[in-house]
From Swiss-Prot:
Lineage: Bacteria, Bacillati, Chloroflexota, Chloroflexia, Herpetosiphonales
Keywords on record: Aminoacyl-tRNA synthetase, ATP-binding, Cytoplasm, Ligase, Nucleotide-binding, Protein biosynthesis
Organism: Herpetosiphon aurantiacus (strain ATCC 23779 / DSM 785 / 114-95)
Residue ranges annotated as motif 'HIGH' region: 14-24
Domain of life: Bacteria
GO CC annotations on file: cytosol
Positions bound to ATP: 258
UniProt key word Cytoplasm: yes
Official protein name in the record: Glutamate--tRNA ligase
Any one Pfam family match given in the protein's UniProt record, by short name: tRNA-synt_1c
Subunit and interaction comment: Monomer.
Entries under Gene3D superfamilies matching the protein: 1.10.10.350, Glutamate-tRNA synthetase, class I, anticodon-binding domain 1 (1.10.8.70), HUPs (3.40.50.620)
Family, as annotated: Belongs to the class-I aminoacyl-tRNA synthetase family. Glutamate--tRNA ligase type 1 subfamily.
Enzyme Commission code(s) on record: 6.1.1.17
């Protein structure tokens, strides 16, 4: 008999106000993993009811970010589903009907006081040393009945409990008890004068109607949790499993911000971080499988993810550690797969075609093992591989001549090496290794006197992949041509 949990329905419900940031992605990942672990469904819902903060194009950025990172949704925009529409601005009648239902139950009311009137009353109360308003009906100087009869605009507010306790259960922190009298929270707006709902109403209604079983969200929602809990109670609905995950912190222990590296997910991908590394690393911020396992495939994360292992304390996002994870993934990636990943960066650098050919991909696959150990970001590939595709431009004589070396002698050595290479029949790394070491020994030279000029001649730099392996993959013709060019450049500079 399987001990697999009951299939869960989780969701990501972003507001289209900007990009999906790396800190937010961690919470999304937890929701996605739990749905996959239980064999359930992960929903995407767009909470676009705050029209003042709405940013054109943000929804497309959010969906493309999830697609780029590989966290596809089972229901929501693009894919549809039985609970469509999945955009809250297209569900206004649903929220309006539920707001009216709460009014009918006597747990919500229409407030006809305008924002200016409330501000004026609060100013007067403050001058008298009284606290600000918590309830917004039957206010002095405002005739609610007359305004209702005149068809005036109104907000719908929830009548928060002011006695007793609101007892909530969180999977991470356990039971939390709120003293309703001590909350001192103003009755929250559920429906605005423009007919649009607030988060408090829309999110709770949608979570219930869409069958969300587990609500995973940041622990910064805990202070306003009594509102959401009381809305569920007012409707008589079963509460979902509430899971308040710890904040993602910066290296200084403060909430993650842009200065810590909390930039958009697409920016990280554009820089050359691979989804596998991002997902693996983020999964470990606030959660762990055990005390020692760090590297896990997506399949392993799905199999091992358990909400009960989420820690209540915040986890630190360390960009350097993410970079380390990324390097490990790149080093362990099959060259053919890695070639596909670096190809767009090589294309952008003008080293290969915009649409890479099979021959170009084969070449990249051949070159990559020589630099793979040094690769930490896909975007570093053009700098590491450029000399395989284009000849070095403008040799620096200071680089061609070894320390304490002689330019004329170096030109002579390059000429002798070229002659030796021309006679080579088997052009591979072992043969070239033997040939060059024999060459050094026979002439009584030191290795740097020979190897350094060759390295600079073929790559244009003093640091490159293994010399013999590089010579082998560049091929005989390219090697001879570059040595000739380098020798000529040095000879001209020495005149």
């Amino acid at each position: 008999m399987s001990d697999r949990p009951t299939p869960a329905r989780t969701r990501f419900a972003p507001s289209p106000t900007g990009y999906l940031h790396i800190g937010s992605l961690r919470t999304v990942l937890f929701s996605w993993l739990w749905a996959r672990h239980t064999g359930g469904q992960f929903l995407l819902r767009i909470e676009d009811t705050d029209r003042k903060r709405f940013v054109e194009g943000a929804e497309e950025q959010l969906t493309s970010s999830l697609q780029a990172i590989g966290l596809m949704w089972d229901e929501g925009p693009i894919v549809g589903g039985p609970h469509a529409p999945y955009k809250q601005s297209e569900r206004l009648e649903i929220y309006q009907a539920h707001a009216q239902a709460l009014i009918d139950k006597g747990v919500a009311y229409r407030s006809y006081a305008t924002a200016d009137e409330i501000a004026a009353i609060n100013a007067e109360r403050e001058a008298r040393g009284e606290p600000k308003l918590l309830v917004f009906r039957n206010l002095p100087g405002i005739d609610d009945a007359a305004r209702e009869a005149a068809g005036a605009d109104y907000n719908v507010r929830l009548s928060l409990k002011t006695t007793g306790q609101t007892v909530v259960q969180d999977l991470v922190r356990g039971q939390i008890v709120f003293d309703n009298a001590a909350l001192k929270m103003p009755d929250p707006v559920l429906l605005k004068t423009d007919g649009f709902p607030t988060y408090a109403l829309a999110a709770m209604v949608d979570d219930h109607l869409m069958g969300i079983t587990h609500v995973l969200r940041a622990d910064e929602w805990i202070p306003t949790w009594p509102i959401h809990h009381q809305i569920y109670e007012a409707f008589g609905w079963e509460q979902p499993v509430w899971v308040h995950v710890p904040q993602v912190l910066g290296s200084d222990g403060k909430k993650l911000s842009k200065r810590h590296g909390d930039t958009s997910v697409t920016e990280y991908i554009d820089l050359g971080f691979v989804p596998e590394a991002i997902i693996n690393y983020l999964a470990l911020i606030g959660w762990s499988y055990d005390d020692k396992t760090e590297f896990m495939t997506l399949e392993e994360l799905i199999e091992r993810f358990d909400l009960n292992r989420i820690r209540p304390s915040g986890g630190v996002f360390d960009r350097d550690k993410l970079l380390h994870f990324n390097g490990v993934y790149l080093r362990n990636m099959a060259p053919a797969e890695l070639a596909q990943r670096v190809a767009p960066y090589l294309s952008k650098a003008g080293l290969i075609s915009a649409e890479p050919t099979a021959a170009e991909l084969a070449k990249i696959t051949e070159y990559l093992p020589l630099v793979q150990d040094r690769l930490k970001l896909l975007s570093e590939a053009p700098e590491l591989l450029d000399f395989f595709f284009v000849d070095p431009q403008g040799y620096d004589p200071a680089l061609l001549v070894p320390k304490k070396g002689d330019p004329a002698q170096t030109v002579e050595i390059l000429g002798q090496v070229k002659a030796s290479f021309e006679a080579v029949e088997t052009w591979d790394a072992p043969s070239l290794d033997k040939l060059l070491h024999d060459f050094v020994n026979q002439l009584g030279l030191k290795i740097p006197q020979v190897f350094m000029p060759i390295r600079v001649a073929i790559s244009g730099r003093t640091t490159s992949p293994g010399l013999f392996e590089t010579l082998a993959v560049l091929g005989k013709a390219v090697t001879l041509a570059r040595i000739s060019t380098a020798a000529a450049a040095l000879s001209s500079a020495s005149v």
